[in-house]
Amino acid sequence: DFLFARTMIGVFKNIEYMCSRTSSKTWGKDAWKKIVVCVISDGRAKINPRTRAVLAGLGCYQDGIAKQQVNGKDVTAHIYEYTTQVGLELKGGQVSLKPRTGCPVQMIFCLKEKNQKKINSHRWFFQAFGRVLDPNICVLLDAGTRXGKDSIYHLWKXFDVDPMCGGACGEIKVMXSHGKKLLNPLVAG
């Protein structure tokens, strides 16, 4: 739940940043309407119950609705959709909900019935949601990755400036909290 919340907080801050770009032709106060956050979880039995609780708090998951079969046919995935105005906060390793002061966030949560690994989740995103949403760009983040407040904007900007750009990546930095020193020089460098 902590890693998931850290990622979502970074995504929320990026959406707020895009909404704050009032002189932009693309973004501005209604930028949130152009952004959909898709969360894909790999396996109903595998999802962390605390992460499930965070998703429920955001409004994009309801416990007790998912079934393994419907009318005798196996279910592949469960899809929840919600525009949330709930924010997240990290305090001492705990995740708490708070009212969002920024713009709303459109969310889709896909809970796959079976654990079929990361590449299958990527395929789900591109083949299922990509076809329906028809996005101009997609940014994939693993749980635990915290994007800087404007990182996603800068990734988008690379595509906007060069329409022939087929891919872009951001920089990943090691996070050391509260002045702790890394003892492994291979990781610290």
Swiss-Prot record:
In the record, what lineage is assigned to the organism producing the protein?
Eukaryota, Fungi, Dikarya, Ascomycota, Pezizomycotina
| Reactions catalysed according to its record | [(1->4)-N-acetyl-beta-D-glucosaminyl](n) + UDP-N-acetyl-alpha-D-glucosamine = [(1->4)-N-acetyl-beta-D-glucosaminyl](n+1) + UDP + H(+)
A biological-process GO annotation = chitin biosynthetic process
- Record keywords, A-Z: Cell membrane, Cell wall biogenesis/degradation, Glycosyltransferase, Membrane, Transferase, Transmembrane
PANTHER family reported for this sequence: CHITIN SYNTHASE, CHITIN SYNTHASE 1
What is the main EC category here?
transferase
Instruction: Name a GO molecular-function annotation.
Output: chitin synthase activity
Name of the protein in its database record: Chitin synthase 1
- Native source organism of the sequence: Aspergillus niger
Q: May I have one GO cellular component term?
A: cell septum
Gene behind this protein: chs1
